[in-house]
Amino acid sequence: MKNLTTLLILILIISGPSFANKVNIFEFTDTELSELEVRKVRGADNKTEYSVGSNDNGNYLKAVADNAASGLGKKVKIDLNKTPIINITWKVEKDLVGIKENTKKGHDFAARVFVIKKTGATPLSNRAINYVFSSNNIVGFNSPSPYTKKSIDN
């Protein structure tokens, strides 16, 4: 995974924004929200509640979790030669205090975006980079997932 991360960083350095094509993955509409795949996290009591809103900056997705964990998924093929940059904007209203995010018990984040590269026939063979909004670490931190060596939390 270290090589993958290094490769990703090199691609980002070599390819400036002027060379990148913009691909909007989400439009954040009620119709789109109803079509997204929702996956409840094993062991969670409830699913996260999702809704769509808008403000001066455009549409957004709001997620509220109370003893809940789930994710929204959308499969998209991206050509990294044409679109090597990911741009994530998020607003967190409440940090998760008192947890150790790099442990299985505390592996929780106020916001998280998974970028998964399919590398084999099963989900366990995939590689992932998880862009996270950490409540307890400095900007730029990264850590291997406590669940698998094939996933890095950034």
Show where each model-derived region lies:
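Positively charged n-region of N-terminal signal peptides that target proteins for export
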Residues: 1-5
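Bacterial N-terminal signal peptides
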Residues: 7-15
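Extracellular carbohydrate-recognition regions
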Residues: 20-43, 131
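Residues that flank catalytic or metal-binding motifs in active/ligand-binding sites
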Residues: 24, 57, 84, 107-111, ...
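Short carbohydrate-recognition loop motifs
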Residues: 48-71
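Extracellular/lumenal carbohydrate-interaction signature centered on repeated Trp-anchored short motifs
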Residues: 75-86
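Solvent-exposed strand-to-loop "edge" motifs in beta-rich extracellular domains
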Residues: 89-95, 118-120
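Extracellular/luminal beta-rich ligand-recognition
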Residues: 108, 112-153
